[in-house]
């Protein structure tokens, strides 16, 4: 079975990319357990708690990330450099994601056969 990586690299609510990626991730998790989830660049904002998407007339899909345990999605990484650049090092995110430096993150990403970016 191919290993599939989902990479979230865009901020939430500015486009449908994050929501579509999350929908694809949850659907794919029904077919395989060989999944990895990566949050890089502005994608780290996907995991911030306390977002108010209704203020910009967007759907609140961020709470759906909390379903990772229910879907047995446990391979989750977040870019440590992206967190530092955005001043987010000491935040409790909506999911448990392991911070990795860019070199280690690229190495981990290299273990996947398919990479889908949202």
From Swiss-Prot:
It holds the Pfam family DsrE. Gene3D superfamilies: DsrEFH-like (3.40.1260.10). It comes from the Bacteria. Keywords: Cytoplasm, tRNA processing. It is found in: Cytoplasm. InterPro entries: DsrEFH-like, Sulphur_relay_DsrE/F-like, Sulphur_relay_TusC, Sulphur_relay_TusC/DsrF. Transmembrane segments: none annotated. PANTHER family: PROTEIN TUSC. Belongs to the DsrF/TusC family. Heterohexamer, formed by a dimer of trimers. The hexameric TusBCD complex contains 2 copies each of TusB, TusC and TusD. The TusBCD complex interacts with TusE. This is Protein TusC. It comes from Salmonella typhimurium (strain LT2 / SGSC1412 / ATCC 700720).
């Amino acid at each position: 079975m191919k290993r599939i990586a989902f990479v979230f690299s865009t901020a939430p609510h500015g486009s449908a990319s994050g929501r579509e990626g999350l929908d694809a991730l949850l659907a794919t998790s029904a077919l395989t357990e060989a999944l990895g989830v990566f949050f890089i660049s502005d994608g780290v904002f996907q995991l911030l708690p306390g977002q108010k998407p209704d203020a910009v007339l967007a759907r609140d899909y961020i709470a759906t990330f909390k379903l990772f345990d229910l879907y047995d999605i446990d391979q989750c990484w977040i870019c440590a450099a992206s967190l530092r650049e955005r001043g987010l090092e000491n935040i409790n995110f909506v999911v448990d994601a392991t911070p990795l430096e860019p070199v280690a993150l690229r190495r981990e990403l290299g273990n996947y056969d398919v990479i889908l970016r949202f």
